[in-house]
Amino acid sequence: MKKIYQWAVGQSFKKLDPRQQVKNPVMFVVYLGALITTILCFYPMGIPLWFNISITIFLWLTLLFANFAEAVAEGRGKAQADSLKQAKKEVMTYKINSLEDIKEENFIELQSSDLKRNDLVYVRAGEQIPADGDVIEGAASVDESAITGESAPVIRESGGDRSAVTGGTTVVSDYLVIRVTSENGQSFLDKMIAMVEGTQRKKTPNEIGLQIFLITLTIIFLTVSITLVPFTDFSSQLSGKGEALSLVIVIALLICLAPTTIGALISSIGIAGMSRLTKENVIAMSGRAIEAAGDVDVLLLDKTGTITLGNRRASDFLPVHGVSEEQLADAAQLSSLADETAEGRSIVILAKERFNLREREFQQSEVKFIDFSAKTRMSGIDYRGDVIRKGAADTMKKYVQSKGEDYPSECDKIVDKIARAGGTPLVVIKNNRVMGVVYLKDIVKNGVKEKFADMRKMGIKTIMITGDNPLTAAAIAAEAGVDDFLAEATPENKMNLIREYQEKGHLVAMTGDGTNDAPALAQADVAMAMNTGTQAAKEAGNMIDLDSSPTKLLQVVQIGKQLLMTRGALTTFSIANDIAKYFAVIPVLFYSIYPQLDRLNIMGLGSPLTAILSAVIYNAVVIVALIPLALKGVRYQEKPASQILSHNLLIYGLGGIIAPFIFIKIIDLILSLIIL
């Protein structure tokens, strides 16, 4: 952090370049004012030189403090970008012309920067993946810690939704043949570095709108200030008292009344918001996406991995009439001994825990394991003349009936009961006889129900997306506490649901990782793609989660809302400050011409010169005081918007009015003692 501050100090002076200053119109007015007062130091025009120099110094400090706030925010991003740049380095790689060329004598050795889109490269264990691409052959463990920070390697393989690889990651085992999907300089890592450094950061619509508002206020105060010189000159001549305000005092008054506090911090608030998101290992492709996350009022959440743990577990054995629970458990365990899925392992463990049934040792000749296939939709075992199978209820019903056996209606009732409870029924048969049903339960993650309740308080509607049947979906939705659900979801009805809410004026957020998610991701206002997902999903999203955790969407929404809350709170504080400074300073400046105004000098400020200088000093110092808040953000509160508004008006509105009166008075007392 020390290095960031040192770098930021240097940048504060570099940013005094007028080409940089003109990008922020409010602070550019301060810049012009500082230049004019600097020139006037050589031509005092009846104003004490100490006053002129003091005003000039604190106007320049106001600019430097504003530059420092922005530079610190940029410095954090730069530090993150530097760590990413270490992953992006030139490496030698092996290009091949086709999959048939996977022989060392056919390898073409070249630099990674020379690769073109659609080139095929061969990457072995220990070698760095040279560019973004899709795996078209092979399966390997890949170390993605350079990108995600996660030390555990992940599996990347051809086909499916885990085929995308990122340049800069390292193959740990086996080999991969990769088709390059990006040109040099346009990789995912390049985009990450550009976004984190802020080189591609554009002002968001909200920022532009706020800046227009601040410029309008500044123009109003500028117009008022310009008229003060002739007005006070005329008034002093008419009343025969006092004298016209000097140009230095008018400039100082303008800077005090203009919304310089929020003008100084507006850029750093936006940059810090993106930095907070990056710390959560989420890369936003634009600041607009973060702001949209703050305004989101509909969340589409995948059931698996977001609401539930993702692995269903066996929780009960429910036998049909004439079969004991232990007999069902024995058959279910036998049928699952070769099943390496989480569900299969949980059946073996539950049977062991309930009835002390241990895994058997078999002779190869007496056992035949039947693996699950998409065609048969069942798995099982042939063991010592017994044929044991387990599978989905509808599949097993057809299987039993095809063998000419009766399928008990009792089993249908058990299946229906499990589905209504939100579980998945797995029917077990032995020698064409139905033994009963294994109850596989989706385990809802701890704390999600409370999280969804908080979202509801904030006016955010949560919708669970699942491929389960409506009965199962309804039960899990009730247990998790979501507001609605979409069962038997397809890419088409996901996209239609998003459009339906958008047409009603809602902003919708969702996550996705597969090619089939791409259309819905492209349609959503906030679309967070998983880093483990396909290239199509990443390109359709406007955010990428490097940890590939769908639950992260909730944190993204919180960060977006925190950014908007911070900007709103500091804008409220800044404008309240301006109002307070107006009533604190104006009576003192004019009471020499209009003695009656002395009654409004409720603070008892010493003189016009110390009053205006105190206001200028306060104006500069308050920027420094608010830098930590701008960078960290206001405390996030899971409350309705109306309550948050009331809270911010009380804290930042009332606080913004009281603070100037207190601190300007203290500074004025100190100045009065020094001058005396």
From Swiss-Prot:
User: Where does this protein chiefly localize?
Assistant: membrane
Q: Where does Mg(2+) bind?
A: 513, 517
* Entry keyword annotation includes ATP-binding: yes
Q: Which UniProt keywords apply?
A: ATP-binding, Cell membrane, Ion transport, Magnesium, Membrane, Metal-binding, Nucleotide-binding, Phosphoprotein, Potassium, Potassium transport, Translocase, Transmembrane, Transmembrane helix, Transport
Spell out the subcellular localization from the entry. Answer: Cell membrane
* Superkingdom in the source lineage: Bacteria
The UniProt record gives the binding positions of ATP as 339, 343, 372-379, 390
Q: Which residues form the active site?
A: 302 (4-aspartylphosphate intermediate)
Q: Which residues cross the membrane?
A: 24-44, 45-65, 212-232, 246-266, 573-593, 611-631, 656-676
Q: Name one Pfam family in it.
A: E1-E2_ATPase
Q: GO molecular function terms here?
A: ATP binding; ATP hydrolysis activity; magnesium ion binding; P-type potassium transmembrane transporter activity
Which EC numbers does the record give?
Answer: 7.2.2.6
Catalytic reaction equation(s): K(+)(out) + ATP + H2O = K(+)(in) + ADP + phosphate + H(+)
**The keyword Magnesium is assigned to this record:** yes
Q: What class of enzyme is it?
A: translocase
Q: How does it sit in the membrane?
A: Multi-pass membrane protein
GO cellular-component term (any): plasma membrane
| Cited PROSITE patterns | ATPASE_E1_E2
Its family remark reads: Belongs to the cation transport ATPase (P-type) (TC 3.A.3) family. Type IA subfamily.
Q: What does this protein do?
A: Part of the high-affinity ATP-driven potassium transport (or Kdp) system, which catalyzes the hydrolysis of ATP coupled with the electrogenic transport of potassium into the cytoplasm. This subunit is responsible for energy coupling to the transport system and for the release of the potassium ions to the cytoplasm.
Task: State how it assembles.
Answer: The system is composed of three essential subunits: KdpA, KdpB and KdpC.
Name of the featured protein: Potassium-transporting ATPase ATP-binding subunit
- Please tell me the species this chain comes from: Enterococcus faecalis (strain ATCC 700802 / V583)
